[in-house]
Design a protein with these regions (language model features):
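Conserved structural core of kinase catalytic domains
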Residues: 66, 87, 91-145
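C-lobe/activation-segment region of protein kinase-like
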Residues: 137-141, 145, 160-163, 176-232
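Active-site-adjacent loop/helix micro-motif of nuclease/hydrolase catalytic cores
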Residues: 72-79, 123-126, 193
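Conserved catalytic motifs of the protein kinase core domain
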Residues: 59, 107-109, 179
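Juxta-kinase regulatory segment immediately upstream of eukaryotic protein kinase catalytic domains
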Residues: 1-31
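Well-ordered, non-membrane alpha-helical segments in soluble/globular domains
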Residues: 75-84, 136-153
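ATP-binding glycine-rich loop module of kinase domains
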Residues: 27-84
Length: 232
């Protein structure tokens, strides 16, 4: 789960943990905005770019995603392939991201650098059903994007090498402040049901729960799409 816009608490502002990334200047300001995800911490920062608008340098906001675990080169190739699959199938719904290997807090590891998404509404939260239906009616582009997301996700589940896209993280699929749908997870974005029994023959109950929650939320997205079409 990746949370990109929730500001740090006042306590967190004074107790920021260290994050020393060798290839990122310490002068680049960033703040920890989420430490609750399954795979990573999320830091948010910004800097002025060389691009200009009306004679003024633009300000670019970005997120740094730092994994909880150490990843091998093979792991990193899997992460990149999965993210590239997202980008190829979902286009601009998935932010551009760079997977970089460097020294982080004294150890070799990977981090993800991506443009920040300003989360406006949690489209995958079933408690927001009525509001979600109204928003999909009001913003047809978002509705088309969500329909594309659902179609692609179902295709992955029903195709060869079946996989379930990670909707377990509540903030993985959102509507941004431009009223467009964004998928913002980065680390291990798919669950594979054929791995449920792979370790010693025992059922992986944690993985099973994540798959079931993701499938329920996918069904919920199909439901709000149908409801928004019925009321048009």
């Amino acid at each position: 789960m990746d949370s990109e816009t929730k500001p740090p608490s006042k306590r967190a502002e004074y107790e920021q943990p260290e994050l020393d990334i060798a290839c990122v200047s310490p002068r680049v300001r960033r703040a920890l905005v989420s430490d609750s995800g399954n795979h990573c911490q999320v830091w948010r920062g910004g800097r002025r770019s060389d691009e200009q608008t009306d004679g003024q340098n633009n300000f670019v906001e970005f997120v740094l995603k730092y994994p909880r675990d150490s990843y091998t080169d093979a792991d990193i190739r899997i992460l990149r392939r999965q993210y590239e699959m997202l980008r190829e199938s979902l286009g601009d719904m998935v932010p551009e991201a760079l997977f970089a290997i460097t020294c982080i807090n004294g150890k070799r590891n990977v981090f993800v650098l991506a443009r920040a998404v300003n989360i406006w509404f949690n489209i995958a939260n079933p408690t927001n059903r009525e509001e979600a239906v109204g928003l999909l009616q009001k913003y047809p582009m978002a509705r088309d994007q969500l329909q594309q997301f659902v179609d692609v996700a179902r295709g992955w589940r029903e195709g060869p090498n079946p996989r379930v896209i990670d909707l377990y993280g509540m903030d993985n699929l959102v509507m941004d402040n431009q009223r467009q749908i964004r998928y913002i997870d980065s680390f291990y974005v798919f669950f594979f049901e054929d791995l449920l029994h792979i370790l010693g023959g025992e059922r992986d109950l944690d993985l099973e729960d994540k798959i079931n929650v993701s499938l329920r939320r996918l069904a919920y997205l199909e439901e709000i799409l149908a409801l928004s079409a019925d009321k048009q």
